[in-house]
A protein has these predicted regions:
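GST-like fold's C-terminal all-alpha helical module
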Residues: 99-177
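GST-like domain detector, emphasizing the conserved glutathione-binding G-site
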Residues: 1-131
Length: 177
């Protein structure tokens, strides 16, 4: 049986990471039987990143690769009726949401307006993580944001980038440059 390894739940959502939640939702919608294991330590994961699955002894990382694996292995037809235009729309929305993940994650870990509430809620729900451990996770994520690029934005520009990604103000992209 397929086992999904992802970050733990938070705020009533099955996974507090958008990529893990994407895989979880896909597996549920496609009715693929699976076991869901919540982990904090991603060191066993491919490239040290969650989510990943183990399926009949094969370890697969990356949310889109996991979904492609499930479609092929279990002969899923969940998207079979989509037209070419609908497939393009699906791809564009998926890319937008994947880009938006970084902005939202940054808001949780680096934006002082949101970080205290996120930290306190996380520690309250997951007692095995203390403030020191959480600060280490914050430092780790800060490095990830820098190397990904989102950590090099100024906060005002990051908000404009988020608005642009959400298509609420397409002209905001000019201000980000």
């Amino acid at each position: 049986m397929l086992t999904l390894y992802s970050y733990p739940e938070l705020f009533g959502v099955a996974d507090n990471n958008g990529y893990g939640l994407k895989v979880y939702a896909f597996l549920k919608l496609a009715r693929v039987p699976f076991v869901h294991e919540h982990v904090f330590d991603a060191s066993a994961a491919p490239r040290g990143q969650l989510p990943y699955v183990v399926d009949d002894g094969e370890t697969i990382g990356d949310s889109e690769t996991i979904i492609a694996h499930a479609i092929a292995k279990y002969r899923l037809t969940i998207d079979a009726a989509l037209s070419p235009e609908q497939r393009r729309t699906n791809h564009l929305v998926t890319r937008m949401l994947d880009d938006l993940y970084w902005v939202m994650s940054y808001s949780r870990w680096k934006d002082d307006r949101y970080y205290p509430a996120f930290r306190d809620a996380f520690i309250a729900q997951h007692k095995q993580i203390d403030a020191d451990g959480f600060e280490k996770a914050k430092a780790y994520n800060s490095q990830r944001y820098h190397f990904q690029g989102i950590g090099r934005y100024r906060c005002r520009h990051l908000r404009l980038h988020r608005e642009y990604l959400l298509l609420s103000d397409p002209d905001a992209a000019e201000d980000v440059r």
